[in-house]
Every structure is written in C-alpha cells, then in structure tokens.
Amino acid sequence: MSNDISVLIYSCDSYSDVWNPFFTLFFRYWNCPYQVYITTESKECEWENVITLNTTGEKWTDRIRKAVEKIPTKYVIGMCEDMFFRRPVRQEIIDYCYWEMEKNPEIVNFNFEKTLTPTEDCVYDNFSRRVCRCDYQCSCQPTLWRKDKLLELLSGSQDPWEWEMTEVSPDDYYYVWTGNEDELVFEYGYHQKWFGIQKGKWVLDDVRPLFAKEEIQVDFMKRGCV
C-alpha cells in the first residue's frame, strides 16, 4: 500500500516561511508511511524525507499538474501547506479508503474535510457521496485522489478557487467525510472560511496558542496577522 500512495503538499515560494511549522506538526502527528513531496516554484525545501518538485506555470493548476505528473504512484493525498495538524492522523481511515478505491475504480477521491455542501448517503462508513455538480468536488483540503483522474481535472488553466468550482462528470464518484467532527482524519482547525492563515496572514487566535503549546517559534510580523 505505501508504494501506491504519495503525499503532495501544494505550496509556493512566498509561503516558504510556513514550511517549518507545517512540517513540524505534520511529522509530529503523522507517522506517514508514504513518500512526501512539496511543489513550489524555485525554492528547495530542506526537510528530511521531503522531495521538492519545482514547477512553473501561468496558473495554479498548471504548476500542480506538472508536479503530479512527476509522482510515480497510483494515488496522491493532496493538501495545502497552511493546514497545521493538532492531533494524530487517523491512518486506519486512509487505509480503508485506499482499499475501497482499489475495489471500485469509479471512485475518484475521498475528501477528508468536514462537508458543508449537499451529499447523498452511501455504503462507506463515515462518508457520503457529494451531490452531482455541487461545489468542492475538487478540493484543496486533504484528499486521497486517484492520480489519473486528478490529472484530468487539472487540465484547465485555473487558480485554486476556480478549480474548486470545477464541474465534474456525473459518472464519477466523489466522497466526503460526514462522520463526527471530533473524529476527523486530519484535524487542522478548520473554521468554514479560515484556518491558520487567511488571505496570506496569520490568524493569531488560531495559531498563537497552537504554536505556543507545540513550542514552535514563528515571527508573526513577517507575514502579518489578522
């Protein structure tokens, strides 16, 4: 299984100051069994066991597509670099989703965020199927993707907000977490419209107590605060 899945962190040069707190918490709360990649334009991430994929493009999807093309595995867990873990990742749920995707090729992804959009009941524990043509069938939040389908969905030239509104085929299946909020697979402090960073600035009410608890030093003034 570990040879079938990779993790791709969506990032950019201007967020390189976020990498230290992100990866500190990432590896503290996840004994990740997969190869981890980060995509950015030109900088090199120096974290041990993290491979940097430098890509350029006119739009966000152009860069991410080029990065995904370089990843050799059948599945990719994608997420952004401003999602700071607060408790252990539930690896057993990721394993469960992997095996269901192996058995059912029509499944495009399992999205691990708490859904705010319409869903339909399904047979998978703690998940529901996203209603056809609803928003966020493509999501930048933690998601286990079938790589070939992810590449198809990245074929346009879009920014991340446009991409999350992409209209997808009604023949494909997209699932999202509808279990208890206190049992999320990845807990990163999501509050509907923001988490650790909002519009490029630190959300102090969120990250200051978190980083103090985790003994992570950050100069909040460099990025600014809200």
What are these regions (language model features)?
Residues 1-75:
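N-terminal anchoring/stem segment of glycosyltransferases
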Residues 37-38, 76-78, 108-113, 144, ...:
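A structural signal for short, well-ordered beta-strand segments and their strand-loop junctions
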Residues 74-84:
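Short beta-strand-to-loop acidic/aromatic patch adjacent to the donor-nucleotide binding site
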Residues 87-118:
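Conserved donor-nucleotide/metal-binding helix-loop-beta segment in metal-dependent transferases, i.e.
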Residues 122-135:
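Short, flexible, basic/aromatic active-site loop/helix in glycosyltransferases
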Residues 137-202:
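Catalytic core and acceptor-binding pocket of nucleotide-sugar-dependent glycosyltransferases
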Residues 193-226:
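Hydrophobic helical membrane-anchoring modules
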